[in-house]
Amino acid sequence: MKRIVGRLLLLLLLVSCDNHKPTKLIILLVGDQMRPDHLSRFESLYTGGFKWLLENSVVFDSAYQQHGYTVTGPGHFAIGTGIYPGPGGVLGNEYFDRELGRVVNCVEDPKAHPVGGVGTARSITRYKTKGIGDMIKDADPKSKVFSIGGKDRAAIFLGGQNPDIALYYNNRDRFISSTFYTDSLPEWVNEYNDNMNLKAYKDSMWNKILPDSFYIKYSRQDYFNGEVDFYHDDEHDLNDNTDKKKNIYNPVFPISFDKGVDPGKEFLDTPWFDEKLFGLSEITIKNAKLGSDNHPDLLCIGVSTMDYILHNYGPYSQEAMDYFLRLDIVLGRFINYLDQQVGLEYIEFILSSDHGGLPIPEYLPSLGMEGGRVSREHLKEAYEWINDEISEIYGDNLFVRSGAKFYFNHERLRKNNISLDKPAQVIKKYLSKVDGISAVLTKDEILASKEKDAITIRLKNMVHPEKSADVFALIKEGYLYRSSYGTSHGSPYDYDTHVPLLFAREGRKYHHINHHAETVDIVPTILDILNIQTEINLHGKILPIK
């Protein structure tokens, strides 16, 4: 009897192993300014891609970008490499480069040229850190890696050092690349670009896809002070033959392009862009034959549009809600296409975001939070006082300021035997008086700190020992540098660092895990899924998804 039971158990084990399909394709979806509640608040309304992802996923409820400057470049870098952005040298979307003596774009490449259309050549040439795609290719040179994004830095940091290609929107009418990656675009990409026909959208109107009652229940009223209003044609003077706009503040649906605006230049700001982004992703899967063999492939997709919409209207707006409902539909079509082209049983999906975001400050009281907008005038005044006093005591040009970050001339400090602490105290004296500034810190103070709280850890993970600013201001919780309208991100606080993170696969039981996870955990977890070993000292850990 025991022998029979043993044989039955062995048979069940073999059947189980036979049903475990190999992973042929990794789909890495990265939102921009997406918060976890964009999944949870609208979960009952989702019918497409988000619904499928959630129903077949393990969701990490306590997932964070564990670094202190939460913007697009560093966030995508952390996801794509498994390395914190500070040690990796990705100090922001733009930052002061001490060697060059100027502010640089994080993915600029002066030696490269645009490929496929007019635009700016970008690449990862400033960094040597390998990405997840490089690690996959190191293990299997026949694997293919494609990275596509609305923003250049999204596509580039997700793609790593050696993708087959990185494609990004040129803010005109096409997806382009640079000579760092290729000398020419594949013909199917050129054909797709030629057929996008963005000018046809010039009269398109963004309307809600559900009745008003749903938006009142799941978001807030449409007109809300603090939202950005770019569209003014709805209230211009119809009797004015010059069609001169009155620019009346009216941030409500419907939304469209103002008269005379080239749709291509603002297309990334609209929900229609996602249709083009995932359309390009579909033809990439087909023409590059991704997932067609047993050499695992990677497709990274940077969903950049949501950042523009959330900057303009905030995470609780009707516009944000409608955007995610529309993206749900687009994702649903994309997942259906993948099922037909590859088979969902062979695909691992990962969804996360480069950072979260603060609700519009004017809405914070409704959430029981305090906040506001730092006065540009007060900041300007403080900067002038700082410059005047430091120049008077130590001479001109002792530092370079980039935003609220101060880079000192270390050679002059050493030559004149000046301790950095002394001019730093001048900066602290004036900036600490500005309403909305929580603290003024030095790089050395952060690195020397023994504190183990989340804020200190995140600040440390954003520091590069040589390249980072010497002194910088830490904004107060709930405050923005952005003035007048809209919202933003960039702080080390939970509303900016807390991001969605899920791993989805057909048949996986939907469940939530509440223990701490980080975006740098994505790379080692993908490697574990693919049974790939790496000698790289990754900052992340393998997450329990099986």
Give a label for each model feature.
Residues 1-22:
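Bacterial Sec-dependent N-terminal signal peptides
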Residues 84, 92-295, 304-311, 435-436:
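His/Asp/Glu-rich, glycine-adjacent segments
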Residues 18-58:
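Active-site-proximal N-terminal segment of extracellular/periplasmic enzymes that hydrolyze or transfer
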Residues 61-80, 147-157, 302-304, 353-356, ...:
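Short, solvent-exposed turn/loop segments enriched in Gly/Ser/Thr/Pro and often Arg
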Residues 377-418, 488-530, 544-546:
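Substrate-binding rim/cap in mid-to-C-terminal beta-strand-loop elements of soluble/periplasmic
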Residues 267-293, 306-347, 424-430:
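A long, amphipathic alpha-helix that forms part
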Residues 52, 129, 133-137, 403-440, ...:
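Non-catalytic, well-ordered alpha-helical segments in soluble enzyme domains
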Residues 62, 93-119, 161, 173, ...:
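Secreted, luminal/periplasmic, and some membrane-associated catalytic domains
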